[in-house]
């Protein structure tokens, strides 16, 4: 859901993106996410991977309460909003042009007491990483963020910076093309990776990753 160009072959499936909003119920809250495909493109619509990520979070297999969480390529902010509703301290990020739209969705969907635990912040992968604490997050979330090959290396650089040895990375994606599988191969050179959830109707995979332990005797 990062603010980057995207081409989808199944054009009829895109009709839902032209709706002005998308409604969901997660974490015992009714959510209405504004969408604006014409003005903002892919960053301003709710992709299936974000929905499935929220479904996975609701299963309770990852403890979010009080955890330092960062969402990459947040787009409409659905995943970060749900994480905040589940009592995480969340930094929700995307590229600068998406931030006003993202911030508006956060404010519209989070109660005031939850907003204090949320920061909306600019993050272009691989750039300005010193603004974020190295290894400073317990959980990194990303939904539908691995579809452009020229972003793979900076994304991996970003993950390496944000993650400590105990950080859990959760990535939700649809495996559309060979390049998507190639990214997972690149990820496995630096992280242990396992599939933890699959939603058949939407054909979305959720992967859990954590940094490979470095040998201390080298």
Give a label for each model feature.
Residues 1-218:
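S-adenosylmethionine-dependent methyltransferases
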